[in-house]
């Protein structure tokens, strides 16, 4: 093996698949709410020689020598993260959002402690107590629901559930919720039952960083967790923030040696780059456009007779109840059809869904990725029109082929 060979010469099979994925990303309208396009600078950092360095431990407290440079990189990432989110302490080592949540749980809870989060069906996340997740296996998980009529958080009902359950930890933050979260009300509820408050801002981190969504630290959240790769537009990875020194010490132990060994320094460098980018004025303008696009997009569907869960969106995503359009529709059927015309969404449960999680009654739509590409309101209005036409001709392959050409024509304007 010649280590100086590039990927194309060393492994043609993997090189070709990456090239195919590059084409797919250029030739599809990507509406997955949890995806985005990172900058070249983020890619450069993540693909750097930092991947060669093992650095178990924390800056100035490593188990390996030769960490002078990577210590500086991790310190910079921490400094930028705390500045961006207005926090005193940050752990930038979690490999993912799930591991960030796991590390926070390790810090705050003991096995068997009670946790309270939003039902997965209503927009929560697997790591907020689902039985198939560590969070439902190691801890006694309880759930609150959205209001059955408004499909929004019902803080009075959440309070009732909390008073009944008496959880050790309350989780606020979701994977499929399109309205603003009132963290201060969650803080009041948590204080009333003497619980920790953890905010999982994985989806809305970019909005929070720019002041376009309330920050959980304004409500004195005990812990804030996040991913990097959604609205924050960074590499895949996790982040934990807190303002409380004792909690921070426990978090550090919870991550290392609790659930991880050596951190991915190349990813931490990419996180640092993403934090710097998020402090630029242009990033706030981008986030404003993400919200404008999502709002316009959702309204375009409503005007065509689609039911948007909770009536609309305040952030970067929304859910469409496809069964309201046609009882024979399912989220999986619509998502699979849309992929044929180069529009990518994901099937998603909606509140009180009667379908199985791999079938669903809804689809989830997000605007971050295509806003990065350059889409504006009028582009999303056109996409809504194309999606509606395709849905109304679900089984007409010839018609769908025509719609696909219109999708490619739209994308060609942005791929020059």
Swiss-Prot record:
One of its GO terms (molecular function) is pyridoxal phosphate binding. Catalyzes the reversible interconversion of serine and glycine with tetrahydrofolate (THF) serving as the one-carbon carrier. This reaction serves as the major source of one-carbon groups required for the biosynthesis of purines, thymidylate, methionine, and other important biomolecules. Also exhibits THF-independent aldolase activity toward beta-hydroxyamino acids, producing glycine and aldehydes, via a retro-aldol mechanism. Pathway: One-carbon metabolism; tetrahydrofolate interconversion; Amino-acid biosynthesis; glycine biosynthesis; glycine from L-serine: step 1/1. Belongs to the SHMT family. Its cofactor is pyridoxal 5'-phosphate. Its main location: cytoplasm. It catalyses: (6R)-5,10-methylene-5,6,7,8-tetrahydrofolate + glycine + H2O = (6S)-5,6,7,8-tetrahydrofolate + L-serine. It holds the Pfam family SHMT. It comes from Onion yellows phytoplasma (strain OY-M). One of its GO terms (cellular component) is cytosol. It comes from the Bacteria. It is an enzyme of class 2 (transferase). InterPro entries: PyrdxlP-dep_Trfase, PyrdxlP-dep_Trfase_major, PyrdxlP-dep_Trfase_small, Ser_HO-MeTrfase, Ser_HO-MeTrfase-like, Ser_HO-MeTrfase_PLP_BS, SHMT-like_dom. The lineage of its organism: Bacteria, Bacillati, Mycoplasmatota, Mollicutes, Acholeplasmatales. This is Serine hydroxymethyltransferase. The record marks 229 as: Plays an important role in substrate specificity.
């Amino acid at each position: 093996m010649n280590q100086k060979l590039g990927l194309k010469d060393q492994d043609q099979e993997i090189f070709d698949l990456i090239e195919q994925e590059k084409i797919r990303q250029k030739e599809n309208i990507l509406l997955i709410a949890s995806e985005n396009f990172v900058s070249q600078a983020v890619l450069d950092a993540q693909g750097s020689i930092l991947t060669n360095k093992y650095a178990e431990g924390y800056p100035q407290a490593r188990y390996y020598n030769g960490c002078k440079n990577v210590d500086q990189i991790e310190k910079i990432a921490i400094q930028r993260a705390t500045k961006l989110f207005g926090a005193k302490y940050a752990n930038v080592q979690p490999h993912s959002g799930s591991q960030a949540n796991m590390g926070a749980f390790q810090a705050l809870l003991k096995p068997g402690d009670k946790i309270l989060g939003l039902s997965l069906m209503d927009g929560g996340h697997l790591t907020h107590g689902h039985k198939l997740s560590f969070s439902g296996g190691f801890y006694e998980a309880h759930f609150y629901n959205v209001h059955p009529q408004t499909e929004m958080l019902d803080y009075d009902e959440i309070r009732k559930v909390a008073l009944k359950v008496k959880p050790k930890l309350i989780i606020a933050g979701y994977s499929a919720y399109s309205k603003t979260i009132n963290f201060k009300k969650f803080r009041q509820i948590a204080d009333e039952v003497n619980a920790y408050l953890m905010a999982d801002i994985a989806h809305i981190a970019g909005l929070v960083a720019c002041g376009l969504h309330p920050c959980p630290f304004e409500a004195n959240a005990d812990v804030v967790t996040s991913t990097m790769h959604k609205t924050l537009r960074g590499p895949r990875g996790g982040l934990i923030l807190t303002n409380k020194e004792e909690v921070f010490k426990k978090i550090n132990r919870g991550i290392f040696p609790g659930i991880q060994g050596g951190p991915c320094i190349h990813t931490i460098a990419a996180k640092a780059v993403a934090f710097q980018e998020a402090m630029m004025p242009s990033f706030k303008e981008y986030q404003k456009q993400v919200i404008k696009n999502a709002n316009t997009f959702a309204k375009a569907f409503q005007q065509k007779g689609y039911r948007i869960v909770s009536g609309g969106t305040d952030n970067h995503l929304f859910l469409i109840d496809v069964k309201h359009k046609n009882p024979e529709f399912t989220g999986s059927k619509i998502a699979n059809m849309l992929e044929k015309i180069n529009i990518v969404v994901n099937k998603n449960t909606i509140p009180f869904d009667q379908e199985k999680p791999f079938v669903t009654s809804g689809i989830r739509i997000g605007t971050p990725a295509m806003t990065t590409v350059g889409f504006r309101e009028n582009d999303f209005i056109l996409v809504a029109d194309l999606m509606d036409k395709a849905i109304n001709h679900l089984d007409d392959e010839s018609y769908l082929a025509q719609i696909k050409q219109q999708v490619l024509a739209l994308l060609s304007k942005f791929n020059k």
